[in-house]
Regions:
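Condensing-enzyme catalytic core mediating Claisen C-C bond formation in acyl metabolism
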Residues: 1-18, 22, 31
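Buried hydrophobic positions in well-ordered alpha/beta secondary-structure cores of metabolic enzymes
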Residues: 7, 32, 43-46, 87, ...
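Alpha-helix termination/capping residues and helix-transition junctions
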Residues: 37-40, 100
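Beta-strand segments within the central parallel beta-sheet cores of soluble alpha/beta enzyme folds
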Residues: 40-50, 77-82, 106-111
Length: 115
């Protein structure tokens, strides 16, 4: 089984924002990409966890929107809603894709950003 590691992190300021969650996600994701010192083109998929986008923002396509805001409009995206475990569900699925070999280079190492 392949090993998985978090190689970059990013965060937005806590508090009220005038931006939608996909924009906040893109800001944190861009920070994580810089922190990991990888090219955005190394990202093969996006796993987006959000429980309020549909109701609060009237936007049901947050994953593809976030990928587009990151400049990666053609990568596959999956949005997760799982109440208080939403982030866990998204992270878990990203890990499963990497460890199964479905994502990442086909050798011993794997680069994948789960944001």
């Amino acid at each position: 089984m392949r090993r998985v590691a978090v190689i970059g992190v990013g965060v937005t300021k806590f508090g009220k924002h005038d931006r939608i969650s996909a924009e906040l996600f893109a800001e944190a994701a861009a920070q994580a990409i810089r922190d990991a010192d990888i090219a955005p083109s190394a990202i093969e998929a996006l796993y987006y966890g959000n429980v309020t986008g549909g109701e609060g923002e009237r936007q049901l396509h947050m994953g593809p929107l976030a990928a587009t805001l990151l400049g990666l409009p053609t990568i596959p995206t999956t949005r997760f809603e799982n109440a208080c475990a939403t982030s866990h569900a998204a992270f878990r699925h990203a890990m499963m894709e990497i460890t199964s070999g479905a994502l990442g280079p086909r050798n011993a190492s794997s680069i994948m950003a789960s944001l």
